[in-house]
Amino acid sequence: MFPHRKDVAFIKAKHGKGAAQNGRHSGSCAQAPASRWKQVLLTLLIFIALLALIGGALWQNICYNRTHYTAEFYQVHSRKLTQSCRVVFLTDLHLREYGQDNCDLVQDIHSLAPDLILLGGDLVTYGEGSNYDNMLSLCSQLNEIAPVCGVLGNHEDELYFLDGDQALVEKFTAAGVTILRNQEARYTVRDNVISILGVEGSPEDFYNYGASTFMDSVEPQTDYDLRICLAHVPTYFPEHLENYSFELGLAGHTHGGIVRLPKIGPLYSAEEGFLPDYAGGSYGLANNATLIVSRGLGDSSWVPRINNVPELSVIDID
């Protein structure tokens, strides 16, 4: 028995509606992959843009740190000083120049009006030739501002001991710098007698090259108003030097840890490895002295400073 015409019409209409729905479903499936590709492309573009922003910020930071420095001010109290004095401490310049013939650096130091200028070593870089004219010129200019005294760093030691540049210390002396190699220098500043101790080498050299003998020999002295101890490597102090009497220790060498991470601090130093304890700033020692570790003014490795502005240290002592 055949269906009536109305029934046939209803069946056709029903099949037509189903076909239309099937058509819509197949269109959605075709559009879904295209939508996903758009999302992937958008995510990729956002990621590339973020990388570009971060890379640009890092590059700007690196370039800034190669041409700028900051003066970091420290306050140290002394029990015996009758009048306050100011010390400028610079270290790890590594032949870098700030302005023609370091004119910007010299002008800034002159404006700070220091009573003493102390050097922490590594004004030169081992392996970069033997032309130290800019460093010697800087020393001569500094000597016109205030007495200049300092120690050698590991780069000067390598030039002296490995390359046999015996004239290096003589060049410093001719430029007006007193270089202390396990020696003491004394200065009278504003009626105060200031004793400067210069310890040579690194902590592992303490008992081998005269540093321990020197420190033992000056320990009984009390005829001074302030004693400052200089050593290039900061770990020298907690390992050995804090067993002796002085009020202020000064060191450099670490370049501020190269990279300084927000809320974490310095990333690396040669002596202490990752996350070093002594890589820039002020620290208390067991002998109640203050240790100031400068971030230094230059670089000697291919790794750039990041978030780590070079430092000129200014210490006011009262």
Protein language model features and the residues they cover:
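N-terminal membrane-anchoring alpha-helices
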Residues: 1-81
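Acidic, His/Gly-rich catalytic cores of divalent-metal-dependent hydrolytic chemistry
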Residues: 24-27, 47-70, 285-318
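Beta-strand-turn-beta hairpins that frame and shape the catalytic cleft
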Residues: 74-88, 177, 184-198, 222-228, ...
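Membrane-embedded segments
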Residues: 84-178
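Active-site neighborhood of phospho(di)ester-bond hydrolases with catalytic His/Asp-centered motifs
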Residues: 90-91, 116-122, 147-154, 180-183, ...
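Solvent-exposed loop/turn segments at secondary-structure junctions
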Residues: 93-95, 123-126, 154-158, 185-187, ...
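Binuclear metal-dependent hydrolase catalytic cores centered on His/Asp/Glu-rich metal-binding motifs
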Residues: 163-177, 189-231, 237-239, 302-305
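Conserved beta-sheet core of the metallophosphoesterase superfamily
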Residues: 234-313
